[in-house]
């Protein structure tokens, strides 16, 4: 007689062969109809209807992504649908012929084959991970179904049937979720081991191979079966009531702890394997740092929950031992540790009942019950003395929360507060708690510290930079004025950029993605600049791709008059003062508002033909009146844009806009307007005076001539700008 695993494998193989024959027969009939009765497509071939030619994605080398072992024509690559030109039109590939693609879907006996990289499978894996975490938290709740009754009569052991029923329903629902996961595993494509030798791995899409691979894997199907076996439910409803009637308390505790560890440890391993698979396929689990922080915190909480549950069960065993010892000392003791109803449903008991509704009255001589439930009594409880009021409490909240608190406190302090007795089981449990505390602190708390460090890394980086800067300024003995300027600039850059170099963050991204990100960040700001408001989207995309953010602190000089202009700066926030020397002692000042720009000498330098390599000098000094946020275009970037889109910069409207907002043109225009106004005023005054001339008027004429010379000097110093836009 074949073994049970071989029988299952044989059944899966026969079922897959039958389904494949049916699918192959249908596809052959469809091929006959499509090809007009071509006999070459018919026959007894039982191979799946799949092309032997590998798809384009499978033949590429580069990013380690999983590819299929065969080209699925029903799911053509997206790049093929988007390819086309004016000579080769794009064909409508989104509506395939149903007669040809309906029978090419990869289906098996368990349903359609799923791609592990799909969003659907990723969402299901996250939901399963949360369900497995809930299952880890539900299993220790079975321990709290056991309790010791405490009234004016004797103490007895019973099982809270109502609470056990609730926990059983929760556990069964979570096992049903895992059972659905097992069903999906029979449909989920896997990576072929042979394909990992050379290349980046290929997915196996054959339904029969997928089912066979999952069923034969010890860490696959059989491991999942062990995890979802309803062992705790069966033990609590079939075994525990019988053992309570037989008063085998030690055997009850031993069975509970062994069964718990038999399923709890595999569940932990299953969760770890699931998280590793999710990280291997997608590179992340939930995608944010805070989710990782929460997962580690939940794991630490579950570990405390498990430790508290084991502590609760072992405390019940010690109380039962105390009651037996007290009974043996009395001589005439007919003790029954079991209550009259070993399974008691407190939720449906009459409310008029004082205390517990199911207590035993089978004690002929009264045992001093408070002595065994008193932590200050003669019986030494060791580490279980704080559990005495918990195991006899009628409140489920107290029974669940206090052991969790004890577990958190014990694991966090490495069991420093534990004072065990000479009982060997108590000593072993204390050793396990110490080792568990060290292990959890090393793994989970260490991971939490890593996440917190990642969150606080930017702030810490800022603090280290400020400390190093202060040390350097102190070592170089910089004056307090310069130190204050450095501190002001560092604070402003931190407030504006958050301590991050935006260009460095997106530097390694693909060009298309980087361009889209910079367009999203800079497009609205660039549109506010009047010079770029009427340009094409293609030019704006190139400007956004080459724009760099800049920050300047108050009272800082952006550029001095006469210095080479290395970049064109566009002001987004703040005001800039422009100072230009017209002659000795004569300064022309103006203010640039948000939307203005400086360094327009580069624009004429880029458009000039023949081209000169020497950068143009700045015609003015620019000083920040406020904290400035801007973006800049370097000389090479601006030259690239003007060379490739010169047709746009020859536009008459753009020429007028550039001259209107240019600080150089505005200064030149202001000087010429003032000169013309003064000439007109002088001419009108001369007409009013007539021909009368006195010595006083002669002196005034000489003074006017000196002023006229200064005005002409200012006019000639303010040379008409050359923007080469004609």
UniProtKB/Swiss-Prot annotation:
Keywords: Calmodulin-binding, cAMP, cAMP-binding, Cell membrane, cGMP, cGMP-binding, Ion channel, Ion transport, Ligand-gated ion channel, Membrane, Nucleotide-binding, Plant defense, Transmembrane, Transmembrane helix, Transport. InterPro entries: cNMP-bd_dom, cNMP-bd_dom_sf, RmlC-like_jellyroll. Its main location: membrane. Residues 645-661 are annotated as: Calmodulin-binding. It is found in: Cell membrane. GO terms for molecular function: calcium channel activity; calmodulin binding; cAMP binding; cGMP binding; intracellularly cAMP-activated cation channel activity; intracellularly cyclic nucleotide-activated monoatomic cation channel activity; inward rectifier potassium channel activity. The keyword Lipid metabolism does not apply. It is a multi-pass membrane protein. Residues 26-46 are annotated as: Disordered. Belongs to the cyclic nucleotide-gated cation channel (TC 1.A.1.5) family. Homotetramer or heterotetramer (Potential). Binds calmodulin-1/4 with a higher affinity than calmodulin-2/3/5. Acts as a cyclic nucleotide-gated ion channel. Permeable to potassium and calcium in a cyclic nucleotide-dependent fashion (cAMP or cGMP). Could also transport lithium, cesium and rubium and displays a strong selectivity against sodium. Seems to directly participate in pathogen-induced calcium influx. May function in homeostasis, re-establishing ionic balance after defense action and/or other stimuli. Could mediate the initiation of the developmentally regulated cell death programs. This is Cyclic nucleotide-gated ion channel 2. It comes from Arabidopsis thaliana (Mouse-ear cress). The gene is CNGC2.
């Amino acid at each position: 007689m074949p073994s049970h695993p071989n029988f299952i494998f044989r059944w899966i193989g026969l079922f897959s062969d039958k389904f494949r024959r049916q699918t192959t027969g249908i596809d052959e009939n469809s091929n006959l109809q499509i090809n007009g009765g071509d006999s070459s497509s018919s026959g007894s071939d039982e191979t799946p209807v799949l092309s032997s030619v590998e798809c384009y994605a499978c033949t590429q080398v580069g990013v380690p992504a999983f590819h299929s072992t065969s080209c699925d024509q029903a799911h053509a690559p997206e790049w093929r649908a988007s390819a086309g030109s004016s000579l080769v039109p794009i064909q409508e590939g989104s509506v395939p012929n149903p007669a040809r693609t309906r029978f090419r879907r990869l289906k098996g006996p368990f349903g359609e084959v799923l791609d592990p990289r799909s969003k659907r499978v990723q969402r299901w894996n996250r939901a399963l991970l949360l369900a497995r975490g809930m299952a880890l938290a539900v299993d220790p709740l079975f321990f709290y179904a056991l309790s010791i009754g405490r009234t004016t009569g004797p103490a007895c052991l019973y099982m809270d049937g109502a609470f056990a029923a609730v926990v059983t329903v929760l556990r069964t629902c979570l096992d049903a979720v895992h059972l659905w996961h097992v069903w999906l595993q029979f449909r989920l494509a896997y990576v072929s081991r042979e394909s990992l030798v050379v290349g980046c791995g290929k997915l196996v899409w054959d339904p029969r191979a997928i089912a066979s691979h999952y069923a034969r894997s010890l860490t696959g199907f059989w491991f999942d079966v062990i995890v979802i076996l309803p062992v705790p439910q069966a033990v609590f409803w079939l075994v525990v009531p019988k053992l309570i009637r037989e008063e085998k308390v030690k055997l009850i505790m031993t069975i509970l702890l062994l069964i718990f560890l038999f399923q709890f440890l595999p569940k932990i391993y299953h969760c770890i394997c699931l998280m590793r698979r999710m990280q291997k396929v997608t590179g992340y689990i939930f995608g944010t740092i805070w989710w990782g922080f929460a997962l580690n915190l939940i794991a630490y909480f579950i570990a405390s929950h498990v430790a508290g549950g084991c502590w609760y069960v072992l405390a019940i065993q010690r109380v039962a031992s105390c009651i037996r010892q007290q009974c043996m000392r009395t001589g005439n003791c007919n003790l029954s540790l079991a209550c009259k109803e070993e399974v008691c449903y407190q939720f449906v008991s009459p409310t008029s009942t004082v205390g517990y509704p199911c207590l035993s009255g089978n004690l002929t001589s009264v045992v001093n019950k408070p002595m065994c439930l008193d932590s200050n009594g003669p019986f030494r409880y060791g580490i279980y003395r704080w559990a005495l009021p918990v195991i006899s409490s009628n409140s489920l909240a107290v029974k669940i929360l206090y052991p969790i608190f004890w577990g958190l406190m014990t694991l966090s302090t490495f069991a420093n507060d534990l004072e065990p007795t000479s009982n060997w089981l108590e000593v072993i449990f204390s050793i396990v708690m110490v080792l568990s505390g060290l292990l959890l602190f090393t793994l989970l708390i260490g991971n939490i510290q890593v996440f917190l460090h990642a969150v606080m890394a930017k702030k810490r980086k800022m603090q280290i930079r400020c400390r190093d800067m202060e040390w350097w300024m102190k070592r170089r003995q910089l004056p307090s004025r310069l130190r204050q300027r450095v501190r002001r600039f560092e604070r402003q850059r931190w407030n504006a950029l958050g301590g991050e170099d935006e260009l460095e963050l997106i530097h390694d991204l693909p060009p298309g993605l980087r361009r889209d990100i910079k367009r999203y960040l800079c497009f609205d700001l660039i549109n506010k600049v009047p010079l770029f408001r009427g340009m094409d989207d293609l030019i704006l995309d190139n400007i956004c791709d080459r724009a760099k953010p800049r920050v300047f602190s108050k009272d800082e000089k952006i550029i001095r008059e006469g210095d080479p202009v290395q970049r064109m700066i566009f002001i987004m926030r703040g005001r800039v003062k422009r100072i230009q020397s017209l002659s000795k002692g004569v300064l022309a000042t103006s203010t640039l508002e948000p939307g203005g720009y400086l360094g327009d000498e580069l624009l004429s330098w880029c458009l000039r033909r023949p081209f000169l390599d020497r950068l143009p000098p700045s015609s003015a000094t620019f000083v920040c009146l406020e904290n400035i946020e801007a973006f800049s275009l370097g000389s090479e970037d601006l030259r690239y844009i003007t060379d490739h889109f010169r047709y746009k910069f020859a536009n008459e409207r753009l020429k007028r806009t550039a001259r209107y907002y240019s600080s150089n043109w505005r200064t030149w225009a202001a000087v010429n307007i003032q000169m013309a106004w003064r000439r007109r005023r002088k001419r009108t005054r001369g007409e009013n005076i007539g021909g009368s001339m006195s010595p006083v008027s002669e002196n005034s004429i000489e003074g006017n001539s000196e002023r006229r010379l200064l005005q002409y000097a200012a006019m000639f110093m303010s040379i008409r700008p050359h923007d080469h836009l004609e």
